[in-house]
């Protein structure tokens, strides 16, 4: 072929969509139907109509001497350009991506353009006119259309038109259209792929026949999930990835454990058989979990590379593992051993999330997690999503489970490329996997594979799916497995003969039988209803000296009040900070936020990294923290905690998106994978934390008992009744206390800045040890600057956290004390404020108050020792501001009954049972609160004298 001279042709540089634009503009120029760009107008005036005669390729079967100078040819070229773009954008509607259906019928989207162009029209147009990167052998527009339909409408289908970045979109189209994705596999790799499919199918069928009726949530129908994961993992390893994190639900999990994470078949069989086998790793938690929820960590390798693969433990709450695994990855990517922000390297780790086709659009946690993918505080350099699409959710058909054409459509809103692939075409599936990992490593963004198959059995193996999907399951019953399909293809291609295929099958069966033979008989001899909690957990957190030398605290405070020369701190913030200057001097007072900053700095100086996130955490919801400063002239930010001396640990504080569930899951995951780091999540108001309830229930409270998964996550939940209504009053401490058992976490509601300082330092000291556990803190709002919560420097430099505190200047005459009042948090401060105010006369000799700072584990020994001092004690009263059916009362009642014994009565003073946490009228709130306080302090106030009866005040 020869190319003619193009030096005099100004139109030669226009191709494809750009060409279409020029032609449209010329048409407007000729007809005067609209405005034309001045530069193009000048070209039209000088050179006339766009002419491509100089750019015509000559040779056999090519278009020659084609000129668009007449309107008819212009329109034809424009229609071809539009058709090319329609094939790219809508080819997926024609593709054969569902193995249970014939090729999709999306012809209507393309047929209009096709009908308006004859083959002769298409043959007359040079390929380069409509496809600049047309490969060798593509000469005419007809060749272009045939080639693009072949690429875009087979068993691989693509959705890229929503991608906003033109460079990414061009790269994706080039990868697809150049056919580099579908290069023939070597016979060796094809044989290996068949062996893998044979192992997957053989394993599932062996379980089905051997353990009849036991749940396993089979992978059959999307068997290619395992080779797809294999491909992504090993290609990632070739790119230097050190950690691959996988999150998935129960469907197909056993096969992924056995094959991708190389869990021995014998260990899997032992779990089904309830047998003990040497070398098997038992459930690390003391209560355990079902086999299809368990995770595993394994170094996976081939002859060339290796990488560590982690499959996260997972409850049956679909998709909630997603943010947890993202947190794993971020923790693995960051170097936290230097001061300042941690250094992130996204090439060290990446995430694979396996979704269900019903769960991906159905669970809101999916979109919450996707929203994290481009945010500074949460991005992990791209996640590869695989929808294991079996076209049914339990018994619900897809038309009842989503409002979109594809289960993957949600991803379009987050600019994620999507590939749909027929799970019965193994080589197409591997091509999709390769495109996914290449895109992720190059662009550091998410990619989605919609792996479309079917579910061979019911939701679980005891379920009959034909009851609800009779027609589909008639098809499935007669549909060959992907292993059988691929074996036939390899035999037809001469890669393997029938005997060789049978040998592969027999080898798999012999391996399964051999591994099963290693499993001893079932052994339930140690089964017991008495769960043994490890001693280190049962003992609780030991008392730890957490004081910091006064000179060190003063030096830290000086550093906290310093910023670079020329940095313009907002005047109001500057005034707030300058008030802290003398807080550690004699007669100085330390408020909550300063105590926190001092704790953070001292923890960092001891080598513990800190990560704090929340919706307003840099400033603080209540404008109290100001840990990140903003220059008023440049908006540049500065955190003094990044510049303090003697620190070799990172500090990061981030404002989070308006999400609770995904962010809590992320921070939990980060802490699990970075156990040496003090990870803290702060709710904007504690009331909103319940949108993350599934994370508290399934992970934070129970992760160690179920899976041996330790966490030291800190939850900061602003709590306190201040007349602000039902959504700005309660962190619902009753929920956390209901979940409290087996020393699984600490629940506290503090009354002083010093207590906050010490409990943070205590929490930091147990990180990375067997004693670690989460910390749930009901944090203050109005108490942040309350005079009665301020502390002195000596209270920080000396001592330790106190689970219970006695009210000063009360109980001085033990023999006169008749009433012991127990309360916590703001309620205790309200009582103290009333006493200090002196507005009312109370017989304070007859009353003593104990602040329960640590609600769980309850400081029983401390409280018991206080009770013993008062020989004439008549009653123990629990006082709270929450309604009786909320707050700590139902948790405290049995504890107090036991402490009181037979001779001392126990009672309750507080609001009555209510369905809403708080009223909306601030005046009614104030009246109620005053009544609670006065009743608590007035010994003459009689509650019912019946044994163990409870008094509830009513309006």
From Swiss-Prot:
Keywords, ordered alphabetically: Glycolysis, Oxidoreductase, Thiamine pyrophosphate
Keyword Cell membrane: no
GO biological process: glycolytic process; tricarboxylic acid cycle
Matching CDD domains: TPP_E1_OGDC_like
Keyword Oxidoreductase included in the entry's annotation: yes
Recorded catalytic activity of this chain's protein: N(6)-[(R)-lipoyl]-L-lysyl-[protein] + 2-oxoglutarate + H(+) = N(6)-[(R)-S(8)-succinyldihydrolipoyl]-L-lysyl-[protein] + CO2
Enzyme's top EC category: oxidoreductase
A GO CC term assigned to this protein in UniProt: oxoglutarate dehydrogenase complex
Gene Ontology MF annotations: oxoglutarate dehydrogenase (succinyl-transferring) activity; thiamine pyrophosphate binding
Cofactor list: thiamine diphosphate
InterPro entries reported for this sequence: 2oxoglutarate_DH_E1 (IPR011603), 2oxoglutarate_DH_E1_bac (IPR023784), DH_E1 (IPR001017), KGD_C_sf (IPR042179), ODO-1/KGD_C (IPR031717), THDP-binding (IPR029061), Transketolase-like_Pyr-bd (IPR005475)
Documented EC number(s): 1.2.4.2
Annotated function: E1 component of the 2-oxoglutarate dehydrogenase (OGDH) complex which catalyzes the decarboxylation of 2-oxoglutarate, the first step in the conversion of 2-oxoglutarate to succinyl-CoA and CO(2).
Family to which this protein belongs: Belongs to the alpha-ketoglutarate dehydrogenase family.
Oligomeric form and interacting partners: Homodimer. Part of the 2-oxoglutarate dehydrogenase (OGDH) complex composed of E1 (2-oxoglutarate dehydrogenase), E2 (dihydrolipoamide succinyltransferase) and E3 (dihydrolipoamide dehydrogenase); the complex contains multiple copies of the three enzymatic components (E1, E2 and E3).
Protein name per Swiss-Prot or TrEMBL: 2-oxoglutarate dehydrogenase E1 component
């Amino acid at each position: 072929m020869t190319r003619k001279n193009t030096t005099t042709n100004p139109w030669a540089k226009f191709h494809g969509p750009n060409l279409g634009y020029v032609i449209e503009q010329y048409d407007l120029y000729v007809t005067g139907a609209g405005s034309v760009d001045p530069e193009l107008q000048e070209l039209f005036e000088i050179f006339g109509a766009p002419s491509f005669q100089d750019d015509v390729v000559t040779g056999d079967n090519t278009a020659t001497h084609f000129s668009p100078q007449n309107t008819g040819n212009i329109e034809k070229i424009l229609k071809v350009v539009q058709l090319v773009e329609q094939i790219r954008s809508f080819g997926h509607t024609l593709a054969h991506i569902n193995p249970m259906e014939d090729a999709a019928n999306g012809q209507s989207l393309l047929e209009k353009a096709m009908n308006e162009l004859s083959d002769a029209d298409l043959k007359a147009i040079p390929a380069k006119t409509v496809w600049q990167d047309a490969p060798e052998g593509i000469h005419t527009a007809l060749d272009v259309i045939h080639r693009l339909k072949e690429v875009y409408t087979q068993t691989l289908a693509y959705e890229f038109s929503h991608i906003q970045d033109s460079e990414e979109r061009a790269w994706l189209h080039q990868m697809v259209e150049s056919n580099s994705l579908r290069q023939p596999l070597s016979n060796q790799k094809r044989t290996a792929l068949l062996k893998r499919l044979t192992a997957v199918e053989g394993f599932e069928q062996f379980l089905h026949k051997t353990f009849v009726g036991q749940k396993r949530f089979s992978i059959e129908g999307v068997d290619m999930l395992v080779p797809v994961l294999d491909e992504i993992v090993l290609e990632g390893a070739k790119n230097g990835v050190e950690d691959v994190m996988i999150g998935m639900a129960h469907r197909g999990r056993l096969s992924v454990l056995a094959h991708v994470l190389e869990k021995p078949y014998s260990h899997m069989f032992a779990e089904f058989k309830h047998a003990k086998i040497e070398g098997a790793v038992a459930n690390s938690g003391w209560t355990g979990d079902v086999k299809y929820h368990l995770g595993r960590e394994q170094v996976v390798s081939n002859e060339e590379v290796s990488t560590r693969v982690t499959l996260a433990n997972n409850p049956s709450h679909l998709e909630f593992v997603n943010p947890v695994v993202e947190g794993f990855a971020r923790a693995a990517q960051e170097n936290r051993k230097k001061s300042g922000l941690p250094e992130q390297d996204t090439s060290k780790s990446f995430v694979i999330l396996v979704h269900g086709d019903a769960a991906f659009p159905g669970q809101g946690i999916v979109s919450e997690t996707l929203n994290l993918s481009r945010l500074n505080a949460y991005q992990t350099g791209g996640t590869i999503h695989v929808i294991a699409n079996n076209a049914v959710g339990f018994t619900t058909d897809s038309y009842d489970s989503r409002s979109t054409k594809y289960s993957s459509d949600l991803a379009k809103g987050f600019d994620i490329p999507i590939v749909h692939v027929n799970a019965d075409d193994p080589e197409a599936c591997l091509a999709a996997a390769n495109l996914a990992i290449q895109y992720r490593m190059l662009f550091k963004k998410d990619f989605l594979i919609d792996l479309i198959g079917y579910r061979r059995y019911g939701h679980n193996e005891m379920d009959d799916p034909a009851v609800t999907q009779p027609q589909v399951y008639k098809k499935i019953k007669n549909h060959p497995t992907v292993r059988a399909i691929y074996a036939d293809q390899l035999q037809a291609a001469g890669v393997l003969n029938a005997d060789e295929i049978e040998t592969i099958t027999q080898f798999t069966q012999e391996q399964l039988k051999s591994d099963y033979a290693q499993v001893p008989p079932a052994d339930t001899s140690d089964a017991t209803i008495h769960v043994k909690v490890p001693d280190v957990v049962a003992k609780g957190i030991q008392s730890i000296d957490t004081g910091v030398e006064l000179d060190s605290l003063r030096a830290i405070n000086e550093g906290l009040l310093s910023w670079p020369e020329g940095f313009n701190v907002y005047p109001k913030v500057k005034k707030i900070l300058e008030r802290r200057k003398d807080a550690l001097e004699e007669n100085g007072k330390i408020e909550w936020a300063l105590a926190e900053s001092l704790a953070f700095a001292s923890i960092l100086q001891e080598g513990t990294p800190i990560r704090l996130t929340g919706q307003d955490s840099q400033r603080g919801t209540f404008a109290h923290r100001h840990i990140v400063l903003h220059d008023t002239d440049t908006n540049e930010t500065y955190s003094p905690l990044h510049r303090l001396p003697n620190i070799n640990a990172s500090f990061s504080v981030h404002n989070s998106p308006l999400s609770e569930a995904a962010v809590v899951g992320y921070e939990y995951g980060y802490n699990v994978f970075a156990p040496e780091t003090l990870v803290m999540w702060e709710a904007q108001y504690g009331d909103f934390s319940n949108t993350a309830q599934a994370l508290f229930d399934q992970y934070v409270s129970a992760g160690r008992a179920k899976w041996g998964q330790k966490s030291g996550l800190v939850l900061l939940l602003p709590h306190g009744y201040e007349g602000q209504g039902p959504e700005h009053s309660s962190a619902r401490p009753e929920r956390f206390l209901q979940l409290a058992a087996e020393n699984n976490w600490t629940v506290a509601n503090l009354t002083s800045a010093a207590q906050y300082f010490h409990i943070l330092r205590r929490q930091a000291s147990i990180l990375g040890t067997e004693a670690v556990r989460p910390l749930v803190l009901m944090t203050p709002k109005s108490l942040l600057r309350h005079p009665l919560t301020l502390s002195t420097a000596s209270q920080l430099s000396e001592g330790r956290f106190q689970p219970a505190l006695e009210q000063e200047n009360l109980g001085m005459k033990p023999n006169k004390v008749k009433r012991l009042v127990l309360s916590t948090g703001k309620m205790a401060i309200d009582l103290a404020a009333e006493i200090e105010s002196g507005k009312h006369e109370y017989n304070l000799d007859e009353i003593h108050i104990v602040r329960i700072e640590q609600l769980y584990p309850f400081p029983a020994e401390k409280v018991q020792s206080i009770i013993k001092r008062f020989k004439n004690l008549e009653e123990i009263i629990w006082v709270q501001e929450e309604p009786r059916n909320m707050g700590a009362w139902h948790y405290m009642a049995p504890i107090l009954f036991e402490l009181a014994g037979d001779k001392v009565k126990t009672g309750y003073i507080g609001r009555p049972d209510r369905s809403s946490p708080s009223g909306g009228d601030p005046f009614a709130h104030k009246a109620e609160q005053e009544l609670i306080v006065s009743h608590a302090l007035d010994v003459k106030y009689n509650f019912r004298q019946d044994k163990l009866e409870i008094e509830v005040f009513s309006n």
